[in-house]
Design a protein with these regions (language model features):
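Conserved pre-motif I regulatory segment
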Residues: 2-44
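A contiguous, basic/glycine-rich beta-loop/short-helix subdomain that forms a polymer-engagement track
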Residues: 259-293, 308-310, 412-424, 428, ...
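Conserved helicase motor "Helicase C" RecA-like lobe of SF1/SF2 P-loop NTPases
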Residues: 578-602
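Conserved RecA-like ASCE P-loop NTPase motor core of nucleic-acid helicases/translocases
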Residues: 68-74, 503, 572-578, 699-700
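Signature of the SF2 helicase/ATPase Hel1-core->accessory helical subdomain module
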Residues: 63, 76-79, 87, 265-410, ...
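A substrate-engagement module of RecA-like helicase motors
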Residues: 2-13, 66-67, 72-293, 425-432
């Protein structure tokens, strides 16, 4: 088999634009992955930039005869796998031997035909305000109210999708007719082929929605700018789409607009209980993936799979985590839960539309509980909540508010269930006829969502010693969140014993295997290096002579150094910062001192900003944490990367605080240092993206030259030449032309 792996790999690389140059690191990785899969051993692979690590694991996966799930942290990598790498593998193999593949998204990335029917003309969804953290409309007419919006927290919780972003991303039809089985991307479910344009359910979507009154929005969403206009455009698209994949839309709907016509897997009652279930886009996607050999998903989706007890993805033998340095953070987030007042209010509002007026008091009681919870959470904003403070016998304000919300939500859910029993599930709560089953479907969804809310509220009252609770105040109103302190024990029980795992990244954080709970006796670790000539093509400059950051002279000295470096580079600079304040201060100080265009994060959306930087070789881009990873600007547009300081994690991060408490005296080296080293390496890695790239990385933090822990940080960086001389750095840059 190892020989087959090398032969197939050679056949694929010979067709690449690079002309088929052999990559020893890629071949070493492919052989190691092949051995790991055949022997059932876990493997952690550090594969530096330029290795071609995706083919290094996809080729042995394709030849293994096993069902393999590949989990990635970014949409860009998913697109690369589905649009380039997997089709190349399919084309290189004989018909009948090539693997089929699908790229899966979460259920909420697909149009829900039932919700679309309810929100369309003749639909019965109530008008609800948007949830916590979601703006109602950015001031555009028609944005004030969302028809039938059960609120994003209620519908989408537990299915985050950073790879796609809240604005949705991913791609449809990834794969290949025939051998490569088309699919969907990025978040959740697989599917079966439908083979034609679909018609919508009979609840009114068969005709064009032209009046805002049809949506219960007194609104003008002219040109699709308002929420009403966006929903109308989505419903128009719904009549012609074959996949229901949000990525097919010709515009980017707001989270609120898309939430009106979608649903998360957690809150979907299932196709067999849904009037539109036999036409469900998400179920078809899931069936298609179940028939595929290789399934590409978002890492958050894999976390949701684990959190659900394995109910999300099809059975599989092997899981590959690309961008493995993200796994710990993603799993920490995915295996947690959260409760906010917006989620509670949404449940009450939706329930009110389903219950007879005699039950309004139950909905009102839940709304009152939501307001009380908001008030109780306020003093805790941004702080950890000790587990005992939420116990049922605690009489503090927060514990009392949680208990009150729990009791009242339970009562409301019981009323909904009883209403369904009385109606014989054929009429809605007001006694109106329900021939299409729309009211029943809404009640089923609301009961399910209410049950999940009860579960999460119960969880809050019984937080274990291995969990951390805190109040997140980043949204419109505070939210109580719970996460595991360490994910290793959970993964050691629920994941690693079940299937072979391959974890790979250009930067594998120190101690990653241990923190993820990988069994040492069944796990191998290798580093296949990088084919790039860092020693001759790149220089690491550490500004050892800069004054201490607390000094009044620090900002001026940093600006002087940056201006000198940028001048020597002829622009072509990506300046990375650890805070918005530092970024704006540096931009203001440097802008008038350089004769080059200076772009600042926030001037444009990230894709447009990156493209503007890439297209003009004399442009500088100043950016914060969102640009430390995943930004690829090869060639002459980038010759200098500056990093304002070592990117240590925030001291007030609740999960990391809990980990520090647990680690005791070793907290800095076991908690903070590995994360700083990984992010520093990611930032440094923005410079050399191809074998011909050259330039300087300038770290404007003297601690990298003087601190006792500098060796741990330097040891994870590519083997560049190093200097503490500004003259050496400017001379290197000047010599690039």
């Amino acid at each position: 088999m190892a020989g087959d792996v090398t032969d197939v790999l050679d056949g694929i690389t010979s067709t690449l634009p690079s002309g088929g140059e052999r990559r020893p690191g890629q071949e070493e990785m492919a052989r190691a992955v092949d051995r790991a899969i055949r022997r059932g051993r876990n493997l952690v692979v550090q594969a530096g930039t330029g290795t071609g690590k995706s083919l290094g694991y996809l080729v042995p996966a394709a030849l293994s005869g096993r069902t393999v799930v590949v989990a990635t942290a970014t949409k860009a990598l998913q697109d690369q796998l589905a649009d380039k790498d997997l089709p190349r593998i399919v084309d290189s193999m004989p018909p009948g031997e090539a693997p089929t593949f699908a790229v899966l998204k979460g259920r909420s990335n697909y149009l829900c035909l039932q919700r679309a029917a309810e929100v369309g003309p003749g639909g019965r969804q109530p008008e609800l305000a948007p949830p916590d953290g979601i703006e109602a409309g950015a001031g555009a007419p028609g944005n004030e109210v969302l028809p039938g919006h059960e609120q994003l927290e209620l519908l989408g919780i537990g299915e985050p999708d950073p790879g796609a972003g809240r604005a949705g991303a991913g791609r449809a039809g990834a794969g290949r007719a025939g051998a490569g089985a088309g699919a969907t991307a990025d978040r959740r479910m697989p599917g079966a082929d439908d083979g034609g344009t679909r018609s919508l359910p009979s609840s009114g979507l068969g005709r064009t929605a032209t009046s805002s009154d049809a949506f219960g929005i007194g609104g003008q969403g002219i040109g699709g700018q308002g929420i009403g206009g966006q929903v109308r455009r989505i419903l128009d698209w719904a009549r012609t789409t074959e996949t229901g994949d949000r990525a097919e839309l010709s515009f980017e709907p707001t989270p609120t607009a898309w939430a009106a016509v979608s649903i998360s897997a957690r809150d979907c009652p299932g196709a067999f209980r849904c009037p539109s279930g036999n036409q469900c886009f998400a179920e078809r996607a899931r069936a298609r993936a179940a028939e595929s050999d290789i399934i590409v998903v978002n890492t958050h989706l894999y976390g949701a799979h684990l959190a659900s007890g394995g109910a999300v993805l099809p059975p599989h033998d092997v899981v590959v985590f690309d961008e493995a340095h993200e796994v710990e953070a993603v799993m920490t987030d995915s295996l947690g839960s959260e409760v906010g007042s917006g989620r509670i209010r949404a449940l009450a509002t939706q329930a009110r539309s389903l219950l007879p007026s005699s039950a309004d008091r139950d909905a009102d009681a839940v709304l009152e509980a939501a307001t009380a919870l908001d008030a109780a959470l306020g003093p805790w904003a941004g702080r950890r909540v000790p587990p005992g403070d939420l116990a049922p016998d605690n009489q503090d304000a927060l514990a009392v508010a949680v208990q009150r919300a729990l009791r009242r939500v339970e009562r409301l859910v019981d009323a909904l269930r009883a209403s369904g029993d009385r109606d014989g599930r054929g009429r809605d709560g007001s006694g109106r006829d329900d021939p299409d089953g729309d009211a029943r479907a809404r009640r089923d969804r609301t009961v399910l969502a209410g049950g999940h809310l009860v579960d999460d509220l119960n969880h809050l009252t019984a937080i274990g010693d291995d969990e951390v609770a805190w109040v997140d105040d980043a949204g419109r109103s505070p939210t109580l969140r719970v996460s595991p302190i360490e994910v290793g024990p959970i993964l050691a029980e629920s994941l690693w014993p079940e299937r072979t795992a391959i974890l790979t990244s250009a930067t594998v954080p120190p101690g990653l295997a241990h923190r993820l709970g990988l069994p040492p006796d069944d796990t191998d670790e290798i580093d296949v290096g990088s084919p790039f000539d860092y020693e001759h093509h790149a220089l690491l400059y550490v500004a050892a002579d800069l004054p201490d950051r607390r000094s009044p002279q620090a900002e001026g000295a940093i600006a002087d150094t940056m201006a000198a470096l940028i001048e020597a580079a002829g622009g072509r600079t990506l300046a990375l910062f650890t805070s918005w304040r530092a970024m704006h201060a540096a931009a203001e100080a440097v802008r008038e001192r350089i004769p080059f265009t200076l772009l600042v994060q926030g001037d444009l959306p990230k894709p447009a900003l990156t493209e503007a930087f890439r297209s003009d070789p004399e442009t500088c881009l100043f950016a914060t944490m969102g640009f430390w990873q995943g930004v690829d600007v090869p060639g002459r547009s980038l010759s200098l990367v500056t990093i304002d300081r070592i990117p240590f994690p925030r001291p007030d991060d609740p999960v990391l605080q809990a980990r520090r408490d647990r680690a005791g005296p070793s907290a800095f080296r076991t908690v903070d240092l590995p994360r700083a080293a990984t992010l520093l390496a990611q930032g440094v890695g923005r410079l050399v993206r191809t074998s011909s790239d050259r330039g300087v990385v300038a770290v404007l933090d003297s601690r990298l030259a003087k601190a006792g822990y500098r060796k741990e940080l330097l040891g994870i960086l590519p083997p560049m030449r190093r200097t503490t001389s500004l003259a050496d750095a400017t001379s290197f840059l000047a010599g690039l032309d």
